[in-house]
Amino acid sequence: MQERHTEQDYRALLIADTPIIDVRAPIEFEQGAMPAAINLPLMNNDERAAVGTCYKQQGSDAALALGHKLVAGEIRQQRMDAWRAACLQNPQGILCCARGGQRSHIVQSWLYAAGIDYPLVEGGYKALRQTAIQATIELAQKPIVLIGGCTGSGKTLLVQQQPNGVDLEGLARHRGSAFGRTLQPQLSQASFENLLAAEMLKTDARQNLRLWVLEDESRMIGSNHLPECLRERMTQAAIAVVEDPFEIRLERLNEEYFLRMHHDFTHAYGDEQGWQEYCEYLHHGLSAIKRRLGLQRYNELAAQLDTALTTQLTTGSTDGHLAWLVPLLKEYYDPMYRYQLEKKAEKVVFRGEWAEVAEWVKAR
């Protein structure tokens, strides 16, 4: 039976997006998992808890016996069927448990007895997790160029189009503002960090990487925070600022936050519920900055939002949203970003419109 256990192997698994059959309990998987992992547990949460209690009270032999008793008969067969199907569907995959201990070895031995020789990760998830952390620390030492600019400047798209760009917001499943959530739930902090490490490893492996191109982010992106090693390097990085005309920014925001989000909600939930979700999304975003706007200004903008939604529902036009979006940008988002940028003005090395910044970055 096969095992993989070197540091180089661990990095290769992350770079290749090797399918991982993670046999830990769902509660462990939810706390942190590798990007290409699927959760097919040997024990569910209740079974794991019972075995853990038995181990503390009666020792390892009794706990092992209880585990075999709980996962037997039809339950074992159902889980075997799921593992077998996953192995056949992912012939290049590997098994993984918490530390490469009994759980992955038990599943491996059961599969071997059924005629499937499938490798496992010696050291388990813990070893992969440490590899991800160390890789991020090392790769963050390369030079970084940050793409800055006011809301609607197309920063994320510019980063996405660079071969050495890493889309932090895409990995975090959040666009970083009060209106930043997407239809995908954010990952746990550990899973986000693992995904980021894998993306950095893959990007670095594709080319002779000299520097990273990242969006100028705050420490938090929604509920995820950037690893401290990367955040520290970003505070020292050069910044290229996109300065597009206000009208161009409005066009981008209309496409991203009104047209696309309405489409995505409708596609996910259907016309009626999708519309309600879309309305709630916009109201929730505005409500999140109520305190900073002040109650009177918030109420005015919320009323304009309601009017714009009524117009959009009846005519399909999103033009009405400009009545609240324009003042929100001019009175809140733009002054806030300019204030933040002033504090790191010495880091700004280039300013220009979107295409000019893209060309400048390409030449680095």
From Swiss-Prot:
SUPFAM superfamilies: Rhodanese/Cell cycle control phosphatase
Listed EC numbers: 2.9.1.3
GO biological process, any: tRNA wobble uridine modification
Keyword Transferase on entry: yes
Root EC class: transferase
GO molecular function, one term: tRNA 2-selenouridine synthase activity
Catalysed conversion reaction: 5-methylaminomethyl-2-thiouridine(34) in tRNA + selenophosphate + (2E)-geranyl diphosphate + H2O + H(+) = 5-methylaminomethyl-2-selenouridine(34) in tRNA + (2E)-thiogeraniol + phosphate + diphosphate; 5-methylaminomethyl-2-thiouridine(34) in tRNA + (2E)-geranyl diphosphate = 5-methylaminomethyl-S-(2E)-geranyl-thiouridine(34) in tRNA + diphosphate; 5-methylaminomethyl-S-(2E)-geranyl-thiouridine(34) in tRNA + selenophosphate + H(+) = 5-methylaminomethyl-2-(Se-phospho)selenouridine(34) in tRNA + (2E)-thiogeraniol; 5-methylaminomethyl-2-(Se-phospho)selenouridine(34) in tRNA + H2O = 5-methylaminomethyl-2-selenouridine(34) in tRNA + phosphate
Keyword Ion transport listed: no
Bridged cysteine pairs (disulfide): none
Span of domain Rhodanese: 14-137
Active site: 97
Keyword terms, alphabetized: Selenium, Transferase
UniProt subunit comment: Monomer.
Similarity comment: family membership: Belongs to the SelU family.
Function: Involved in the post-transcriptional modification of the uridine at the wobble position (U34) of tRNA(Lys), tRNA(Glu) and tRNA(Gln). Catalyzes the conversion of 2-thiouridine (S2U-RNA) to 2-selenouridine (Se2U-RNA). Acts in a two-step process involving geranylation of 2-thiouridine (S2U) to S-geranyl-2-thiouridine (geS2U) and subsequent selenation of the latter derivative to 2-selenouridine (Se2U) in the tRNA chain.
Name of the protein: tRNA 2-selenouridine synthase
Gene name linked to the record: selU
